[in-house]
UniProtKB/Swiss-Prot annotation:
It holds the Pfam family His_biosynth. Coiled coil: none annotated. It is found in: Cytoplasm. One of its GO terms (molecular function) is 1-(5-phosphoribosyl)-5-[(5-phosphoribosylamino)methylideneamino]imidazole-4-carboxamide isomerase activity. Its EC number is 5.3.1.16. This is 1-(5-phosphoribosyl)-5-[(5-phosphoribosylamino)methylideneamino] imidazole-4-carboxamide isomerase. Keywords: Amino-acid biosynthesis, Cytoplasm, Histidine biosynthesis, Isomerase. InterPro entries: Aldolase_TIM, His_biosynth, HisA_bact_arch, Isoase_HisA-like, Isoase_HisA-like_bact, RibuloseP-bd_barrel.
Length: 240
């Protein structure tokens, strides 16, 4: 299973949020470029970067910093946050980003998602963020009436190969991932699934790996040292 150390960017710094609440923000590193390089040096093989400013503004804000993180870390990166037009997708992918995550627009602008998938294939991932099973958009500020599984099935029909699923109620809480929802997704959609939210320990990563998922994202637990990079490297190499 691929494990992605997470770097969330706000005002040019690495931060962690609690349940997606921007008022509950903790700065974990003032230098995101050094953070990206540190993860890579310690064995990370793929980074997950979120432009939180971009998610709020609806356009990429931290482009320059993200490019420097990629060139410094010298490993693949996937990026999300505020990507809502083909021009933005083009810019990221043409600048060397390996995969872009279309979040809010996956729900609000399915034609854009379809066009991006047709143009770039596996370089496009869909981000589904849900609270109590209902999809949230615009930096998690708006909660829709759309069920997470229904949206995942729509994404599969569009041709999306990778879905990143975040349980907002667990994000940044260290209460463990939502194994039930991930197992439900695994059963009903045949795409690469990446779990996000709540990972608190190596045991959580192992439990996700045993579901047969493509990947998992580790954030707060890494910064709090409840998971080490050596844990990540070892879990990635075990066949569950």
């Amino acid at each position: 299973m691929q494990i992605f150390p997470a770097i969330d960017l706000k005002n040019g710094q690495c931060v962690r949020l609690f349940q997606g609440d921007f008022s509950k923000k903790t700065v974990v590193n003032e230098d995101p470029i050094a953070q990206a390089k540190g993860f890579a040096t310690d064995g990370a093989t793929y980074l997950h970067i979120v432009d939180l400013d971009g998610a709020l503004e609806g356009r990429p804000i931290n482009l320059e910093v993200i490019q420097k993180m990629k060139t410094t870390a010298k490993i693949p990166v996937q990026v999300g946050g505020g990507i809502r037009s083909m021009a933005q997708v083009d810019y990221y992918l043409e600048s060397g980003i390996d995969r872009v995550i279309i979040g809010s627009a996956a729900l609000t602008d399915p034609d854009f998602l379809r066009a991006a998938v047709q143009k770039y294939g596996a370089k496009i991932a869909a981000g589904i963020d849900a609270k109590n099973g209902l999809v949230a958009t615009r930096g998690w500020l708006d909660v829709s009436q759309v069920n997470y599984l229904d949206l995942a099935k729509r994404m599969e029909k569009v041709g999306v190969e990778t879905i990143i699923y975040t349980d907002i109620s667990r994000d940044g809480t260290l209460t463990g991932p939502n194994l039930e929802q991930m197992a439900n997704l695994k059963e009903h959609v045949k795409v690469n699934l990446i779990a996000s939210g709540g990972v608190s320990s190596r045991a959580d990563l192992e439990a996700l790996a045993k579901l047969g998922l493509y990947g998992a994202i580790a954030g707060k637990a890494l910064y709090n040292r409840q998971i080490s990079m050596s844990d990540i490297v070892e879990v990635e190499q075990i066949a569950y």
